[in-house]
UniProtKB/Swiss-Prot annotation:
<keyword id="KW-0812">Transmembrane</keyword>
<dbReference type="GO" id="GO:0017128">
    <property type="term" value="F:phospholipid scramblase activity"/>
</dbReference>
<keyword id="KW-0391">Immunity</keyword>
<feature type="glycosylation site" description="N-linked (GlcNAc...) asparagine">
    <location>
        <position position="146"/>
    </location>
</feature>
<dbReference type="Pfam" id="PF03348">
    <property type="entry name" value="Serinc"/>
</dbReference>
<keyword id="KW-0444">Lipid biosynthesis</keyword>
<feature type="transmembrane region" description="Helical">
    <location>
        <begin position="162"/>
        <end position="182"/>
    </location>
</feature>
<keyword id="KW-1003">Cell membrane</keyword>
<feature type="transmembrane region" description="Helical">
    <location>
        <begin position="392"/>
        <end position="412"/>
    </location>
</feature>
<comment type="similarity">
    <text>Belongs to the TDE1 family.</text>
</comment>
<keyword id="KW-0443">Lipid metabolism</keyword>
<feature type="topological domain" description="Cytoplasmic">
    <location>
        <begin position="243"/>
        <end position="274"/>
    </location>
</feature>
<protein>
    <recommendedName>
        <fullName>Serine incorporator 5</fullName>
    </recommendedName>
</protein>
<feature type="transmembrane region" description="Helical">
    <location>
        <begin position="53"/>
        <end position="73"/>
    </location>
</feature>
<feature type="transmembrane region" description="Helical">
    <location>
        <begin position="222"/>
        <end position="242"/>
    </location>
</feature>
<feature type="transmembrane region" description="Helical">
    <location>
        <begin position="88"/>
        <end position="108"/>
    </location>
</feature>
<keyword id="KW-0325">Glycoprotein</keyword>
Length: 424
């Protein structure tokens, strides 16, 4: 239900940022101007659209999740009174969310509020990105560690490691080559060439560091699989950043405007702007929601706190993200004759409630900054969101470099602090 609330508010924010929807409402809703004046939203409801309206709505949603984050601190049993607040009262929660989003429009001194809230949103958005990058690095280490544990009993795991590593590096190399072909030209596109060279060099660097003797002595499980996963993600972020970069327009020898440094076939993808907007917005919502849900599991919160399973307890399996099938619990055994019921929260919560709400709190800020085009908020609208902007470009490039830095830290930290115990 929390995910449904989140989706409803995100869709509302996208509608508020759509100039097309605003014009359609003005054309087709009778007495539109009278209604806008009646609710004191301006002559054409300008207070209910644009980046300032999105800031207010996301402020209400962020406060909603932050309050529940505080209310659910230190809950270890799903039968406690405060746990019922988290797991029930859905109708009243919906009313509370609506009241908080609406109440944000009545905050006095709106200019000061919007300026201050913008910086809070930027910090929260970057924290949300940081959590995703940390979990990606942890995922790469966990994958290699789990499959390496299987080599002790079955040598076929070596072949699996080699095959997946080869696939990862093939994808990363192929992606960089294709971007060099389609996003650069013989004359010009120097920025794209530099960025591709830098990011390609970073992929080579992390690969060499991962297999260097000094790192191997401290971390025997370090290998090319982790660096291959990170290299693939760096390649993806590089492609995403170049795709988000504003098009460069120059004059050709005939005095006509020509767009350079983008694929020729990319021009046709933006002809139907409504289709691009709908598909792009749906993909954006889906990715953010997936990031929220995968970031709020018990294993992810344990990983962020540095708690991992002991190496001797690792059981190699293809689907290593899921717990291995063990013996039936008492409840499962009793239910074999009838429906199988698993009481997954009988002895404790399967995820940390407060951490769950905190991630959604950060996601609210990330949505606010993303939908309003980060620092180009004044000219932002959802129709031009996918045509590219410098703010989104540099956010993605910064995410790419931070991801590499985080991975390098996991490799180098044991060398810099030999007396400390590092477990990945």
């Amino acid at each position: 239900m929390y995910a449904l609330y989140f989706i409803l508010v995100v869709v509302l924010c996208c509608i508020m940022m759509s100039t097309t929807v605003a014009h359609k409402m003005k054309e087709h809703i009778p007495f539109f101007e009278d209604m806008c004046k009646g609710i004191k939203a301006g002559d054409t409801c300008e207070k209910l659209v644009g980046y300032s309206a999105v800031y207010r709505v996301c402020f209400g949603m962020a406060c909603f999740f932050f309050i529940f984050c505080l209310l659910t601190l230190k809950i270890n049993n799903s039968k406690s009174c405060r746990a019922h607040i988290h797991n029930g009262f859905w109708f009243f929660k919906l009313l509370l969310l609506g009241a908080m989003c609406s109440g944000a429009f009545f905050i006095p001194d709106q200019d000061t509020f919007l300026n201050a809230w913008r910086y809070v949103g930027a910090v929260g958005g970057f924290l949300f990105i940081g959590i995703q990058l940390l979990l990606l690095v942890e995922f790469a280490h966990k994958w290699n560690k789990n499959w390496t544990a299987g080599t002790a009993s079955n040598k076929l795991w070596y072949a699996s490691l080699a095959l997946v590593t080869l696939i990862m590096y093939s994808i990363a190399t192929g992606g960089l080559v294709l971007m060099a072909v389609f996003y650069t030209q013989k004359d010009g596109c120097m920025e794209n060439k530099i960025l591709l060279g830098v990011n390609g060099g970073l992929c080579v660097l992390i690969s060499l560091v991962a297999i260097s003797p000094c790192v191997q002595n401290r971390q025997p499980h370090s290998g090319l699989l982790q660096s291959g996963v990170i290299s693939c993600y760096v390649t993806y972020l590089t492609f995403s950043a170049l795709s988000s970069k504003p098009a460069e327009v120059v004059l050709d020898e005939h005095g006509k405007n020509v767009t350079i440094c983008v694929p020729d076939f990319g021009q046709d993808l933006y002809r139907d702007e409504n289709l691009v907007t709908i598909l792009g917005t749906s993909l954006l919502i889906g990715c953010i929601l997936y990031s929220c849900l995968t970031s709020t599991t018990r294993s992810s919160s344990d990983a962020l706190q540095g708690r991992y399973a002991a190496p001797e307890l690792e059981i190699a399996r293809c689907c290593f993200c899921f717990s291995p099938g063990g013996e039936d619990t008492e409840e499962q055994q009793q239910g074999k004759e009838g429906p199988r019921v698993i009481y997954d929260e009988k002895k404790g919560t399967v995820y940390i409630y407060s951490y769950f709400h905190f991630v959604f709190f950060l996601a609210s800020l990330y949505v606010m900054m993303t939908v309003t085009n980060w620092f180009n908020y004044e000219s932002a609208n959802i129709e031009s969101f996918f045509s590219g902007s410098w703010s989104i470009f540099w956010v993605k490039m910064a995410s790419c470099w931070i991801c590499v830095l985080l991975y390098l830290c996991t490799l180098v930290a044991p060398l810099c602090c030999p007396t400390r115990e590092f477990s990945v």
